[in-house]
């Protein structure tokens, strides 16, 4: 009887505890909802997007399809609004004015480092990029940009062609299927490593370096942005890989110094030869961190863009035909050698890549964190408080009918005919500002900013276009291809870059 009595009391206690828990959750939800509906809003701040769940906020809707979520919010709240994502308050600033506000914000008002360093420092290592003082980071960008010059690009094109042709030789004959993102992701690592990372890294790609890169890449996910340092195996592998990559670069640098091997047309050598303004040579761990950052920035953007370009072209045989005709007309034949100079003579090819970047920007949003007591959105006087993230969203603005005719249609010719409203806004007074690494080259008020703008504009844009032009040209020369009756796949938003769904396959046939 005593046992039965104890069991009965335990069951009763459990039921009561569960009841209190349910009641507590219900009360919390009710308070959260009523606080949004009843409590007066600050009229000087952007409107808040309604959410049902405290802390989590709008994270579920945003995570499922962030572009669609932001577009719906834009219809309801306008170009500027604030939503909550796992305790973080994000103020979104859409349109050309929103781009200008976010990308031109002064360092004492908002900070990219405060937005991203908690995640990137574990992947790139200490004292580089956002983990460095801002002035030092601008010097580091200048070093990297100096290593991405026309003389190097002329040497890079034949390297990329060779790597690409060797890679394609592994494809089955006469026909077969490739998974777009996986295939071009591998190819881009090979080409980028050959041109930028150094011959030693390229020679190691089929072994340990590829595994280290994969482990680092697993530390560059949305969960790492929300929770930068959890006691999980993937986080530990990330940290080990970062240390091993730094050690690897240090050993390569030391070998080059010992053997006086300094005649290398790669970025590694350019960084080894550079010095900071105070006259000190760049420390080995700085070089390693910058090289990792360059590889990540270039590989992610070029891998996704090359995959999306091939997928879009596979759905448009008329454009494939036109691209081949352009090469025959401008270069003489489809067998003519590709060079840094003659790639400039292919405007439709560049337009096809630009159109891909418009519809499928690898980074669909870019953020800063407010570090001043408040920051004022000049257009309407709204005040955004300290601690909020401010966010520009090229993935939304670049498909806005305000700026682009038939914005969801893949139409490379829009960049040649220049009839869209976007072409009236591309340049502004800030296009020639030099933040310490050369003129940025484009106004932050442009609605087309897949590479960002302002002091944090991507410095690898020229190399990216060069790499993409060479790879895409070689692919359309080598293969006929289509989507096997299917449509262009949907976007996968589960990583930090927007990739095609992993089921996206392209059917290819070797050309004579």
Swiss-Prot record:
EC number: 1.14.14.154
Keyword terms, alphabetized: Heme, Iron, Lipid biosynthesis, Lipid metabolism, Membrane, Metal-binding, Monooxygenase, Oxidoreductase, Steroid biosynthesis, Steroid metabolism, Sterol biosynthesis, Sterol metabolism
Cofactor: heme
Pathway of action: Steroid biosynthesis; zymosterol biosynthesis; zymosterol from lanosterol: step 1/6
Protein encoded by which gene: CYP51
Compartment annotation: Membrane
Signal peptide: none
Binding-site residues for heme, renumbered to this chain: 458
Species this chain originates from: Cunninghamella elegans
One Pfam assignment: p450
Catalytically driven reaction(s): a 14alpha-methyl steroid + 3 reduced [NADPH--hemoprotein reductase] + 3 O2 = a Delta(14) steroid + formate + 3 oxidized [NADPH--hemoprotein reductase] + 4 H2O + 4 H(+); a 14alpha-methyl steroid + reduced [NADPH--hemoprotein reductase] + O2 = a 14alpha-hydroxymethyl steroid + oxidized [NADPH--hemoprotein reductase] + H2O + H(+); a 14alpha-hydroxymethyl steroid + reduced [NADPH--hemoprotein reductase] + O2 = a 14alpha-formyl steroid + oxidized [NADPH--hemoprotein reductase] + 2 H2O + H(+); a 14alpha-formyl steroid + reduced [NADPH--hemoprotein reductase] + O2 = a Delta(14) steroid + formate + oxidized [NADPH--hemoprotein reductase] + H2O + 2 H(+)
Job of this protein: Sterol 14alpha-demethylase that plays a critical role in the third module of ergosterol biosynthesis pathway, being ergosterol the major sterol component in fungal membranes that participates in a variety of functions. The third module or late pathway involves the ergosterol synthesis itself through consecutive reactions that mainly occur in the endoplasmic reticulum (ER) membrane. In filamentous fungi, during the initial step of this module, lanosterol (lanosta-8,24-dien-3beta-ol) can be metabolized to eburicol.
Molecular-function GO term, any one: iron ion binding
Classification via InterPro entries: CYP450_sterol_14alpha_dmase (IPR050529), Cyt_P450 (IPR001128), Cyt_P450_CS (IPR017972), Cyt_P450_E_grp-IV (IPR002403), Cyt_P450_sf (IPR036396)
The keyword Protein biosynthesis belongs to this UniProt entry's keyword annotation: no
Protein's name in the database: Lanosterol 14-alpha demethylase
GO terms, biological process: sterol biosynthetic process
Family: Belongs to the cytochrome P450 family.
GO cellular component: membrane
Methyltransferase listed as a keyword: no
